[in-house]
Structure formats: C-alpha cells, structure tokens
Curated annotation (Swiss-Prot):
One of its GO terms (molecular function) is metal ion binding. InterPro entries: Metalthion_dom_sf, Metalthion_dom_sf_vert, Metalthion_vert, Metalthion_vert_metal_BS. A divalent metal cation 2 binds at residues 6, 12, 14, 25. This is Metallothionein. Class I metallothioneins contain 2 metal-binding domains: four divalent ions are chelated within cluster A of the alpha domain and are coordinated via cysteinyl thiolate bridges to 11 cysteine ligands. Cluster B, the corresponding region within the beta domain, can ligate three divalent ions to 9 cysteines. Metallothioneins have a high content of cysteine residues that bind various heavy metals. Belongs to the metallothionein superfamily. Type 1 family. A divalent metal cation 6 binds at residues 36, 40, 43, 59. Residues 29-60 are annotated as: Alpha. A divalent metal cation 3 binds at residues 14, 18, 23, 28. A divalent metal cation 7 binds at residues 49, 54, 58-59. A divalent metal cation 4 binds at residues 32-33, 43, 47.
Length: 60
C-alpha cells in the first residue's frame, strides 16, 4: 500500500486500483493513493481516499 506521489508528475497509477490526475483520485478501490482535496497542498502518506479525494484531515 504505497501512496503514489502526484506532486511530481501530476499523474500516477497506484497498485492498479487508483488513478490520480492533478493530485486527485479519479478512481479508487482501496486506500493507496495520496490525493489532495481542494485547497490542500500536501496530504499525509497512507491517506485514505473516500470517493475521489482524501479526507481533509489528511492535510499537512
């Protein structure tokens, strides 16, 4: 369950079950993606995705 770093390329795939674009999860089946909600510059690693973004409590 390695979080993927969207900040480097803006896109990433994570374990085949997460796809990030512009640091937002476009699809998630498990908590593997380090995706940032609106107004969040960085999310904690291991952040749990709910729907298409992580919870705002993940913000650092």
């Amino acid at each position: 369950m390695d979080p993927c770093d969207c900040s480097k390329t803006g896109k990433c795939n994570c374990g085949g079950s997460c796809t990030c674009t512009n640091c937002s999860c476009t699809s998630c089946k498990k908590s593997c993606c380090a995706c940032c909600p609106s107004g969040c510059t960085k999310c904690a690693s291991g952040c749990v995705c709910k729907g298409k973004t992580c919870d705002t409590t993940c913000c650092q």
